[in-house]
A protein has these predicted regions:
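Active-site-proximal mixed secondary-structure blocks
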Residues: 1-37, 42-167
Length: 167
């Protein structure tokens, strides 16, 4: 069971780095690991669970990995200290390089949940995927479609339960 005070502090830490880069999602499908920057997310309570919604575009390498995963971690990094690593993850595709190796960031594994995270992160949300919904032209307003999806590179909305927080 999550401690609500800890959840409040962790969410507050997260919003201190947004909308500037500083939030990395680490996915692992058992054969591949990948880091991707996250700019759009929501925290809340759904199905009597503390949850986070993340949005991943279909064109992203992490899309395939997340669709074959049960868990992921959200890692809050201090942008001032890790700007080069964050920029690498934002500007490079995991199809073309091993972003974890190239960034020099260290992978940590929770011995109980086996969820991997970034050791250097100031806050980590360990998450279990509950639901995936594809956004498309039929479920978006015309305004949103024109502004964010004119090339039809839609997001998948992934709802995940927050299992654990490390700070």
């Amino acid at each position: 069971m999550l401690d609500l005070q800890e959840l409040h502090l962790a969410v507050n830490d997260t919003f201190k780095v947004l909308p500037t880069p500083g939030l990395l999602l680490l996915s692992n499908d058992g054969t591949q690991k990948n880091l991707i920057t996250i700019g759009w997310l929501q925290f809340g309570n759904l199905w009597n669970k503390w949850t986070v919604n993340v949005f991943i575009r279909l064109s992203r390498h992490s899309f395939k990995i997340l669709n074959n995963s049960e868990y992921f971690s959200l890692n809050v990094l201090a942008p001032q200290k890790y700007i080069n690593q964050i920029n690498l993850c934002a500007q490079t595709s995991g199809r073309n390089c091993d972003k974890i190796k190239e960034s020099g960031l260290t992978i940590a594994e929770n011995s109980e949940t086996k969820i991997i995270s970034i050791a250097e992160a100031q806050t980590v949300f360990e998450c279990k995927i509950l639901n995936k919904v594809m956004l498309d032209k039929t479920n978006l307003s015309d305004d949103l479609h024109k502004k964010f999806y004119s090339n039809d590179d839609f997001h998948q909305l992934i709802t995940a339960e927050i299992l654990n927080i490390k700070r």
